[in-house]
Amino acid sequence: ACCARLCCSVPTSPATTICSSDKFCRCGVCLPSTCPHTVWLLQPTCCCDNRPPPYHVPQPSVPTCFLLNSSQPTPGLESINLTTYTQSSCEPCIPSCC
């Protein structure tokens, strides 16, 4: 898995993670939204392929998929301004990756 070691886990509940495509990371970016991290840490932290992807137009605030595996409320998502990119060559975002 591309980012299994880099995503954080929440001791009290399953981690709520946003998996989105990034222009520099074909396999996806893991944003541990339920962890006490500052916004500057919500940056690309895992890449399966470091090669630059083909040119594409950014789609602001359009996540490719959500992995919400938690019965607890999801804090902080409204205050985080996400800019994601859709790429046809991206691998599917699977729960085992995060």
UniProtKB/Swiss-Prot annotation:
Pfam families (alphabetical): Keratin_matx
Highest taxon listed in the record's lineage: Eukaryota
One of the record's GO cellular component terms: cytosol
InterPro entries in the record: Keratin_matx
Intrachain disulfide bonds: none
Tissue: Wool.
Modification N-acetylalanine, positions: 1
Keyword vocabulary terms for this entry: Acetylation, Keratin
GO function term, MF aspect, one: structural molecule activity
Subunit structure of this chain's protein: Interacts with wool keratins.
Function statement: In the wool cortex, wool keratin intermediate filaments are embedded in an interfilamentous matrix, consisting of hair keratin-associated proteins (KRTAP), which are essential for the formation of a rigid and resistant wool shaft through their extensive disulfide bond cross-linking with abundant cysteine residues of wool keratins. The matrix proteins include the high-sulfur and high-glycine-tyrosine keratins.
Family: Belongs to the KRTAP type 3 family.
Protein name: Keratin, high sulfur matrix protein, IIIB3
Organism: Ovis aries (Sheep)
